[in-house]
Amino acid sequence: MKKRWLASAIALWVLLTGCSAPHVQLETELPEDTVQAPEITPSPEIEQEVQMISGSEKLGSVTYRPDVVPSAFADGEKFSQELYSRLVEAIRQGADAADLSGVEATEAQFDGVRVFLLTRNPWGTLNDVVRDADGNAKITYTTADVQERVTKAAEFDDAVTRLLDAAVPEGSSQLSAAISLYKVVAQTVQQDNEAQDCRLYSALVQGLAQDSSFYAESYSFLLDQIGVENAVVFSEDGEYAWNVLTLDGQSYHCDAQTEAGLDGGQALSCFGLSDAQIAEKNGWNTWRSENETLLQCSKSLFEAVQQAPYADVDAAGCAVYFSKMEGREGVFRYDLNNGEVLEVQSVLPKQLAVLGENVYFINQDDQMLYRCRTTDGDLRQALENVPVSAIRRVGSELRYVTADDPDQTENVISMD
């Protein structure tokens, strides 16, 4: 069924639960009549085919699970859930050994779990895991200091807990949560060839990545936390890595490192791609999967959003806001439940980002920073009569530069 429709900001409706409001020390609330929503000028209607989108299933409250089994290996013959949980518990405690009595695991399963833990190294200090003569596990670390092991493990657990709390509000759909976590990785992990090689710990605690596998492995770990099936895939030479995620039986490519390199992760141009599209984006026509199962990605998730120079997610509202549709600039809302598109503001947005329950954008006409509330379409200046030259979201912060600042200092609007 096809629908044609176009609406103004006054008609914006979004069902939103559990979304924190942003805190802005410099933001000034203006009288209701100070800033009027710009009138919508006649323009061609947006024609969209309305359909259910993959991953529309709603999530409850997401709780960090350190021993969640990676979905890429959950059903394989080279992984043991019980063994993995037992080893994770010991490593997080900084123990030198793990009692494996009662654990039935083949050599192939032991090797599979060992390789996974060594390549991911979430808790930062693991050196190796081997079986001893009694069939238990001997664990060695990069430090002899047990307290340091425990401290680093706690730092990682705390970082992931905070990340999930901020990025995945209760009521998010699987898809909106997956997009939100993708944005976190693309916006907050920076490539640094000198970064300490401790994999997930380095990426999610320190925000540093040596290479693309750090991005892909971090995103994979976070997707497993929200129950989204996924796998890390590698280029033929093994030098580059990205993710394939599966929602409702349909698989898509996601490349957070390429996204980060384009504009600091401010768009969604590399999320939800088909096989043909990923080859265009990162240059790799063939790849292999970490679990030796190659999934076909036959179609794109939302091509219109991918083509916009700026796009951001309202995870709780299960929507994406983006800045360009069919060659026409504006502030648009893509419903992640059914694919419907709504024009929220008929303006020329210089840049766009979502923080909490507000969509922020710079109006090219007056260079002012506006915020449009997603719950009711209320439109105001975010900073009273202060021209702004640039904005970008990094995690739970909106960073902006005022137009008259010769030093281009970044100011911050943050979540409560």
Enumerate the predicted regions with their spans.
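Bacterial N-terminal signal peptides that target proteins for export
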Residues: 1-9
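C-terminal motif of bacterial Sec signal peptides marking the signal peptidase cleavage site
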Residues: 15-18
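Flexible, surface-exposed loop/gating regions in the mature catalytic domains
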Residues: 191-225, 242
